Curated annotation (Swiss-Prot):
Main location (coarse class): nucleus
Family statement drawn from the similarity comment of this UniProt entry: Belongs to the krueppel C2H2-type zinc-finger protein family.
Full protein name: Zinc finger protein 287
Listed PROSITE patterns: KRAB (PS50805), SCAN_BOX (PS50804), ZINC_FINGER_C2H2_1 (PS00028), ZINC_FINGER_C2H2_2 (PS50157)
PANTHER family in the record: C2H2-TYPE DOMAIN-CONTAINING PROTEIN, ZNF44 PROTEIN
Keyword Zinc assigned: yes
Subcellular location: Nucleus
Source species: Pongo pygmaeus
Domain SCAN box, chain residue ranges per copy: 49-131
Intrachain disulfide bonds: none
Domain KRAB stretches: 170-238
Annotated GO biological process: regulation of DNA-templated transcription
Length: 761
């Protein structure tokens, strides 16, 4: 016995035991009526399976037609158009497993409607353990095991199962509801409809429980989709008068009628129905169905009877017909029964010809309506099956949180969330799970098994849900739609995350700093800031990252991959964010505006960085020298001065740089690319800064001003060199003679004195 059953809590145990005892202790009409009241009906798949398994060979149709019908029934059951091979295999295994179970256990397990063989096994295991523990108090569930039984404990565990195989199954007559004709006449239309419903539900419940049931002929009549629209009252019939002349006077006809019709059981009506059906030739008094009917006229005119037998047969046949027609008709029909009159040795009947005018259900018409959800159906059995889904919904309630479940096994699995119980343990790594299905999925990590394959691209998956999600990449299906903005998503989780944009909900809270997040993944990424954990390592340069996405982006530096391409100019980028930034150069859009100076930016990150120029905030500090920076990228670039790291290397000449932008600019030396062009004179430049400086020659702009002498300059470097005149700073020193200079160009010229190099004009 699995640990799950051993550690089952008392709430689950009591619910299973109560269900088992109530089903086992009650038999006959009460048990089935209880099932009716709770509407524990068979699912559509089970009905299709029964139709397939119990399909009779039609002699008149021939073998080819029979094979075609059988194939159609099989397709309705297995549904290969929506089920995978694994799902069809699961249906077959579940069917065979339920077949080999002992009778009463099979009945009980079926009544729980397991959706998989794994769920059915769990039900049997849980029930087995409970009954073993209850065995000392309940002698009806098990027998005393002999002391010298060679089978030992196993015999005790399985003995109660074997005993159940010999139990006798009930028949349809055992559950038939008996009523008298007098009771029927006193019933209201709603009660008559209920009686019809109960009769059909009794039959379908016995089929759903796997019992061998001979189909009474009244069942297909009750299931026929037709309605009575009117009845025709006729006068005396000459044919009836002729037949009535053969009957001699009767002193007390009412006595005969009462005796014959005192108690008419449902199964008796089946016998009369069989007789009438065998003697039917059509014509006078007929119930119309799709395939057959029976005639009272033909039945009464077959042979001559004495008066008493003639009249009593008439009443009995009439009463049974009234019973059938009242069971069938869906609307309350008032039947005007005119009394038989005997006059001077002749029987003249002013009879009612129940000439019920029927019409077939029109195409598309659905006369049967569900009282719960309002859904309509063409056939009554379809309504019964549908109503079972409402009754089966949420039958088991969790005592901890009040949540309801359809199946007891689902409740047991749910309660492990409250208890923290994880009875299913992986033998490979020791990880434990609350459900066996989760363990099965986990074990595929160790085995490498990926049983679910995409038919389009051949990619394999370990879980069916992952395959379903993947297939949407091929179909483009996005079934999850936001009701606020209409945006659609391929995953339900993506829709949930998106909806938090509208609601502003941030349910994930960091325990360290209290910061909230709308997605759990964002919280996990944030928590790595506090822990300092960087589990993702680059195999090329051994750099570590806190997030896998950062590592993927970094690896594109080594591979040179640029998978994001601009549709306007064809330029490619390694990161999607860089492409988005680039696209703003084509649109000119600058939607982020500074509230202080009014300057506009194309990206929110640029606006955030700009704000720091007003506030003076420098949140990024170097741990080595203490220097602070307003941007994290500037800190990263600065730290490379201390560690000497130059991760950006030119593939042509091997020169390395601390910044990727410097490498990009350097590579233009090899390619000769000059992407920055002056609109005034057409001159092109390698660097954007060079273009900016050049354009000032056309505009005359001199934005850099000396605070000492108010002299203006077009370039910042020129201002820096000029300011050294005021400060006397000479940062460039000769290594040979120690002479210092204010500009690097002056130092280069001086060094030629020592080297003997001549300046080129």
């Amino acid at each position: 016995m699995l640990a799950s059953s051993k550690r089952m809590n008392s709430s689950s145990r009591s619910q299973i035991l109560l269900r088992w005892k109530s089903d086992k202790a009650q038999s006959g009409p009460y048990n089935v009526e209880k099932e009716i009241l709770t509407s524990r009906f068979l699912r559509d798949t089970e009905t299709c399976r029964q139709n397939f398994r119990n399909f009779p060979y039609p002699d008149l149709a021939g073998p080819r037609k029979a094979l075609s019908q059988l194939r159609e029934l099989c397709l309705k059951w297995l549904r290969p158009e929506i089920h995978s091979k694994e799902q069809i295999l699961e249906l077959l295994v579940l069917e065979q497993f339920l077949t080999i179970l002992p009778g009463e256990v099979r009945t009980w397990v079926k009544s729980q409607y397991p959706e998989s063989s794994e769920e059915a096994v769990t039900l049997v295991e849980d029930l087995t353990q409970i009954l073993e523990e209850e065995a000392p108090q309940n002698s009806t569930l098990s027998q005393d095991t002999p002391e010298e039984d060679p089978r030992g404990k196993h015999a005790f565990q399985t003995g109660w199962l074997n005993d159940l195989v010999t139990k006798e199954s009930m028949t349809f007559k055992d559950v038939a509801v008996d009523i008298t004709q007098e009771d029927w006449e006193l019933m209201r239309p709603v009660q008559k409809e209920l009686y019809k419903t109960v009769t059909l539900q009794n039959y379908w419940n016995m089929v759903s429980l796997g019992l061998t049931v001979y189909r009474p002929t009244v069942i297909p009549i009750l299931e026929e989709p037709w309605m009575v629209i009117k009845e025709i009252l006729e006068g005396p019939s000459p044919e009836w008068e002729t037949k009535a002349q053969a009957c001699t006077p009767v002193e007390d006809m009412s006595k005969l009628t009462k005796e014959e019709t005192q108690t008419i059981k449902l199964e008796d009506s089946y016998d009369y129905d069989d007789r009438l059906e065998r003697r039917a030739t059509g014509g006078f008094w007929k119930i119309h169905t799709n395939e057959r009917g029976f005639s009272l006229k033909s039945a009464l005119s077959q042979e001559y009877d004495p008066t008493e037998e003639c009249l009593s047969k008439y009443d009995i046949y009439r009463n049974n017909f009234e019973k059938h027609s009242n069971l069938i008709v869906q609307f309350d029909t008032q039947l005007d029964n005119k009394t038989s009159v005997y006059n001077e040795g002749r029987a003249t009947f002013n009879h009612v010809s129940y000439g019920i005018v029927h019409r077939k259900i029109l195409p598309g018409e659905k006369p049967y309506k569900c009282n719960v959800c309002g859904k309509k159906f063409r056939k009554y059995p379809s309504l019964l099956k549908h109503q079972s889904t409402h009754a089966k919904e949420k039958s088991y309630e969790c005592e901890e949180c009040g949540k309801e479940f359809r199946h007891i096994s689902s409740l047991i699995a749910h309660q492990r969330m409250h208890t923290g119980e994880k009875p299913y343990e992986c033998h490979q790594c020791g990880k434990a799970f609350s459900q066996r299905a989760h363990l099965t999925i986990h074990q595929r990590i160790h085995t490498g098994e990926k049983p679910y394959k995409c038919d389009d691209c051949g990619k394999d998956f370990s879980q069916r849900a992952h395959l379903t999600i993947h297939q949407r990449t091929h179909t483009g299906e996005k079934p999850y739609k936001c009701l606020e903005c209409g945006k659609t998503f391929s995953h339900s989780s993506s829709l949930i995350n998106h909806q938090r944009v509208h609601t502003g909900e941030k349910p994930y809270i960091c325990n360290e700093c209290g910061k909230t997040f709308s997605q759990s993944t964002h919280l996990l990424q944030h928590q790595k800031i506090h822990t300092g954990k960087k589990p993702y390592k680059c195999n090329e340069c051994w750099k570590v990252f806190s997030q896998s996405t950062y590592l993927i982006r970094h690896q594109r530096i080594h591979s040179g991959e640029k998978c994001y391409k601009c549709n306007e100019c064809g330029k490619a980028f390694a990161h999607s964010s860089t492409l988005i930034q680039h696209q703003t150069t084509h649109t000119g859009e600058k939607s982020y505006i500074c509230n202080i100076c009014g300057k506009a930016f194309s990206q929110s990150a640029n606006l955030t960085q700009h704000h720091r120029t007003h506030t003076g905030e420098k949140p990024y500090k170097c741990s080595v020298c203490g220097k602070a920076f307003s941007q994290s990228v500037h800190l990263t670039q600065h730290q490379r001065i201390h560690n000497g790291e130059k991760p950006f290397k030119c593939n042509i000449c091997g020169k390395a740089y601390r910044q990727g932008a410097n490498l990009t600019q350097h590579q233009r030396i090899h390619t000769g690319e000059k992407p920055y062009k002056c609109n005034e004179c057409g001159k092109a430049f390698i660097y954007s800064s060079s273009l900016n400086q050049h354009q000032r020659t056309h505009t005359g702009e001199r934005p850099y001003k000396c605070n000492e002498c108010d002299k203006d300059f077009s370039q910042r470097t020129c201002l820096i060199q000029h300011q050294r005149i005021h400060t006397g700073e000479k940062p460039y020193a000769c290594r040979i003679c120690g002479k210092t200079f204010t500009q690097s160009t002056n130092l280069i010229q001086h060094q030629r004195v020592h080297t003997g190099a001549k300046h080129r004009n």
